[in-house]
Amino acid sequence: DALPIYNVSSFGGASVKRIHRPVNAEGKTVSVGSYMIPLLQENCEKAGVKMMLDTTATEILTDANGAAVGVKATGASGETVTVNAKAVVLATGGFGANLDMVVKYKPELKGFMTTNAPGIQGQGIEMAQAIGAATVDMDQIQIHPTVEANTAALITEGLRGDGAILINEEGQRFIDEVGTRDVVSAAEIAQTGSYSWLVVDQAMADASSVIQGYIDRK
């Protein structure tokens, strides 16, 4: 079934409004991930897809010709789990929470925090390399301009798409807030103290449960 995400806004670098977001019963926008994952899980269950939670993949299995034919993993109780398959789809994400790996490929990011989930350690990449997979553009690590420094909470750029502005220590705007993340981040780093304030108005706060969530988190 299609997910009902009909609120449309702009994100960084977009030439037109094309970012679809969900809303709650009050008509306020809500976080996409926490809204979408339960619905995707429900649809997977309807389709008979078997989900193995708390299970960590450790090795991609290959046949005599080197083709990927399954995965070996460790289950929640420490048991070995083997999944044999006709093919393996690698969709493990990146390595943003593995700060040593980040610095290995992009030394200038040493000292940066991460907004990634703790499990984003790059194991999928390493498993693929172990069976001969090539990598490309490993240094192309995205940094985000709106991160709360004390909690590492990522503040969605959807707020900037809705009209929030960035001001520096001198109280001045310094960039087009809906530029691409690399451009906005570079401009922010160049400001005094390498930080900025994200300013929203009351109308934006009233229309978004996400903003209230940021306030409550502090």
List the model feature ranges, each with a label.
Residues 17-27, 52, 115-117, 154-158, ...:
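Short Gly/Pro-enriched turn/cap motifs at secondary-structure boundaries
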Residues 58, 77-78, 88-90, 95-96, ...:
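Short, glycine-/Ser/Thr-/acidic-enriched flexible segments
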Residues 121, 125-127, 131-218:
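An anion/pyrophosphate-binding glycine-rich loop and adjacent beta-alpha core
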Residues 30, 34, 38, 115-118, ...:
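Electropositive phosphate-/nucleotide-binding environments in soluble metabolic enzymes
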Residues 76-148, 152-153:
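Glycine-rich loop(s) and the adjacent beta-strand/alpha-helix scaffold that form part
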Residues 71, 83-85, 176-177:
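Short capping micro-motif at the N-terminus of alpha-helices
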Residues 1-81, 98-101, 144:
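Conserved redox-cofactor binding core of oxidoreductases
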